Amino acid sequence: MNLEKLTTETRNQKTMALDMLSVKEMLELMNQEDQRVPVAVSKELPQIECAVDKIVANFKAGGRLIYMGAGTSGRLGVLDAAECVPTFGTSPEMVQGLIAGGMSAMTVAVEGAEDSIELGQQDLVDLHLTSHDTVVGVAASGRTPYVIGGLDYACEVGATTVSIACNADASISQHAQIPIEVEVGPEILTGSTRLKSGTAQKLVLNMLSTASMVGIGKVYKNLMVDVKPTNEKLVERAKRIIVQATDCSDETAVKVFMTADQNVKLAIVMVLTNMSKAEASVRLDHANGFVRQAVN
């Protein structure tokens, strides 16, 4: 393998004297380089859209969204998956993140794990992957064996496969139905893909999960109406969402929120339709969980 041919491994000509810059100059240069990231992501929007459409269709068929990667790429997938539970009220199984070497690799590198094609396959076998699932392989270099092994197994099962790389003509692109290649250029610190590459991957993952959740009714207007109030902050947010969605008083929001068994989405439908809990629940079920359809 010739890493020198990968853009993510080449030296950034603008930062050759990085160790001689003042802190101010260094931060300004980092900021300038970071501004390239959203522009690079914008060029891949058509591919990201294709991925979202497939994820939504698979969710509606009972499928799951599974991210897999090694190192920073794997950690970002685990992070995005974990946030879906409190934000969108998903089950932990619906969106999952796999990292080469297992969860211990979130904090300590597991030597050799990313180089195992078999490990990538086995991690998906252990999840009992089906044709309704979507597997998103994330690798800044675009050549991680662990990810390639997972994508190949997913293809065998008939699952939808998506790849996210930060190099053009990435190897993993040949193993995915929907390849996404975000070319952010050389890192300011040569080969440190936790920087621009990691930022680019996070932006794409944000899009995949958020847009997909909108597509299955987890959002009303721009409000996260399936939020699960698992702590004090989220309880207060839930009440505020009801007020924002319905223009009702704080007192009404609290009362209906409790009547709806702390189900924000149900409470909103109850207020906007003036229905009982049972009636609103039926209306929401008929609308497949979409608040806008339930109240119109």
Swiss-Prot record:
Which catalytic residues are annotated? 83, 114
What Gene3D superfamilies does the entry give? 1.10.8.1080, Glucose-6-phosphate isomerase like protein, domain 1 (3.40.50.10490)
Q: In which pathway does it act?
A: Amino-sugar metabolism; N-acetylmuramate degradation
A single Pfam family it belongs to is: GKRP_SIS_N
Which chemical reaction does it catalyze?
N-acetyl-D-muramate 6-phosphate + H2O = N-acetyl-D-glucosamine 6-phosphate + (R)-lactate
Q: What are the UniProt keywords, alphabetically?
A: Carbohydrate metabolism, Lyase
Subunit composition and interactions: Homodimer.
**Role:** Specifically catalyzes the cleavage of the D-lactyl ether substituent of MurNAc 6-phosphate, producing GlcNAc 6-phosphate and D-lactate.
> Any further remarks?
A lyase-type mechanism (elimination/hydration) is suggested for the cleavage of the lactyl ether bond of MurNAc 6-phosphate, with the formation of an alpha,beta-unsaturated aldehyde intermediate with (E)-stereochemistry, followed by the syn addition of water to give product.
UniProt name for this protein: N-acetylmuramic acid 6-phosphate etherase 2
Organism annotation = Lactiplantibacillus plantarum (strain ATCC BAA-793 / NCIMB 8826 / WCFS1)
